[in-house]
From Swiss-Prot:
UniProt cross-references to HAMAP family, sorted A to Z: Ribosomal_uL6_B
Protein family (similarity comment): Belongs to the universal ribosomal protein uL6 family.
Signal sequence coordinates: none
Protein name: Large ribosomal subunit protein uL6
Function per UniProt: This protein binds to the 23S rRNA, and is important in its secondary structure. It is located near the subunit interface in the base of the L7/L12 stalk, and near the tRNA binding site of the peptidyltransferase center.
Cellular component terms per the entry's GO annotation: cytosolic large ribosomal subunit
Listed GO MF terms: rRNA binding; structural constituent of ribosome
Record InterPro entries: Ribosomal_uL6-like, Ribosomal_uL6-like_a/b-dom_sf, Ribosomal_uL6_a/b-dom, Ribosomal_uL6_bac-type
Keyword RNA-binding tagged: yes
PANTHER family reported for this sequence: 60S/50S RIBOSOMAL PROTEIN L6/L9 (PTHR11655), LARGE RIBOSOMAL SUBUNIT PROTEIN UL6M (PTHR11655:SF14)
UniProt KW keywords: Ribonucleoprotein, Ribosomal protein, RNA-binding, rRNA-binding
Length: 179
């Protein structure tokens, strides 16, 4: 059996889950998250915990995956997910335009407007160099953070650009001039 798949998922108070066909819907205080449930995997509520079971050994690969996705949904609707980004470089900054757009100035000839998808919120600090992305869907939060980082990935020589908070970067040594 999958070691991750056989762990039960604790359901906190105020969280309900519902399976209709091949869609799992988890509702909680922060909102609702829906996930696709592959065939051959079933969810059941036992002693206040969600238990994931599979039909046979051929579904072993997705057993742990389904458990992890449902667990992420339960944590998302109770605590939420956050991802922090840092913007490093002279003149590089981000600012919020309205509620649904982040405007980046990243050394290009034009500012870049990034529209936030529904269910995702962003906050910019006072210095405009740190960005916090929050939401209830872990996949969406990670995808938005990755797309923002891809606007100007860290440069290997000066480490300027958009990076995840706490990300360790290797700095390359530049060319040595002819003497």
């Amino acid at each position: 059996m999958s070691r991750i798949g056989k762990k039960p998922i604790a359901v906190p108070k105020g969280v309900t889950f519902n399976v209709q066909g091949d869609v799992v819907t988890v509702k909680g205080p922060k909102g609702t998250v829906s996930n696709h449930l592959p065939g051959g995997v079933k969810l059941a509520l036992e002693d206040g915990n969600i238990v994931v079971t599979r039909d046979d050994e051929s579904k072993r690969a997705i057993h742990g995956l389904v458990r992890a996705l449902v667990n992420n949904a339960v944590e998302g609707v109770t605590k939420g997910w956050t991802r922090n980004l840092e913007i490093v470089g002279i003149g590089y900054r981000a600012e919020l335009k309205g509620k649904g757009t982040v405007v980046f100035t990243l050394g290009y000839s034009h500012p870049i407007e990034y529209p936030l998808p529904t269910g995702i919120e962003a906050a910019v600090d006072a210095k405009q160099t740190a960005l916090t992305i929050t939401g209830i869907d872990r996949q969406k939060v990670g995808q938005v953070a990755a797309e923002m980082r891809a606007l100007r990935p860290p440069d290997p020589y000066k480490n300027k650009g958009v990076r995840y908070a706490g990300e360790k970067l290797k700095k390359k040594v530049g060319k040595t001039g002819a003497k």
